[in-house]
A protein has these predicted regions:
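Nucleotide/phosphate-binding catalytic cleft detector across ATP-hydrolyzing
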Residues: 1-15, 19-30, 37-50, 57-162, ...
Length: 237
């Protein structure tokens, strides 16, 4: 049995990034891209490393990136590549947090309206592969309200793959009132790719799309005054 004095591992999975840390800490210890890269060639070695799959930040960001077929491990809030997801969790436990899974309980967030079959698969991997002693899956919207010190309210979660509106009452999500829309950060990336194409710049491969996503995250912002922001952009161009 794991005593209460041993802090739990907290894992937050998302379409763009997955975060992990130790319960009670202010910020996550690890933030990894939710991306898996598989070599386009039969075998591919980067330096002295030879793998069949690269995870998150292990994927090269230089010219070698084009050698990989990139795929998001989580799409629209749902895990679509369980092999890569297992490797990402392994990376978090052993290389980022540097803790043994069997010595810590685990709290893992999940997207609202996650299918029962997906949750069962998640539990199977956590218990059978990582031997975690105790495991709890929590709604991301509920956890967001907890983080703000509230038990009742509406959590609006805008991610990279999906947006959710989650009404919460006394710490419980009202599942029959949850709203979901598959319009999120990914669509902004798609829009930027289209705008780039109109100016003669093509970003068609998965690696090139990641370049556009990186540009979006570093340069785009929400304009509090749209007209003023548009005017300033026209003057600087």
């Amino acid at each position: 049995m794991i005593g209460d004095e041993v802090p739990a591992v907290v894992i937050d999975i998302g379409s763009a990034t997955c975060k992990a840390g130790i319960g009670g800490e202010e910020v996550p210890t690890a933030v990894l891209l939710s991306i898996a890269g598989r070599p386009k060639a039969t075998s591919c070695s980067i330096g002295d490393d030879r793998k069949s799959i690269f995870i998150g930040d292990d994927i090269p960001k230089n010219r070698y990136r084009a050698l990989f077929q990139l795929r998001h491990i989580i799409e629209r809030g749902m895990i679509t590549d369980w092999e890569a997801m297992e490797k990402l969790w392994r990376e978090m436990y052993f290389n980022e947090l540097r803790v043994l899974p069997q010595e810590h309980n685990c709290l893992l967030s999940e997207a609202p309206l996650t299918p029962k079959a997906d949750r069962e698969k998640m539990i199977e991997v956590i218990f059978d592969v990582f031997n975690v002693p105790n495991f709890y899956v929590a709604n991301q919207g509920v956890l967001s309200l907890y983080a703000s010190g509230r038990l009742t309210g509406i959590a609006l979660d805008i991610g990279d793959g999906v947006c959710h509106s989650v009404p919460v009452y006394e710490g419980y999500s009202l599942n029959h009132t949850i709203l979901r829309i598959d319009l999120a950060g990914k669509e902004i990336t798609d829009c930027l790719v289209k705008l780039m194409k109109e100016t003669g710049n093509s970003f068609s491969t998965s690696a090139e799309r990641e370049i556009v996503r990186d540009m979006k995250e570093k340069t785009c912002f929400v304009a509090l005054d749209f007209d003023q922001a548009k005017k300033e952009a026209e003057q600087s161009s």
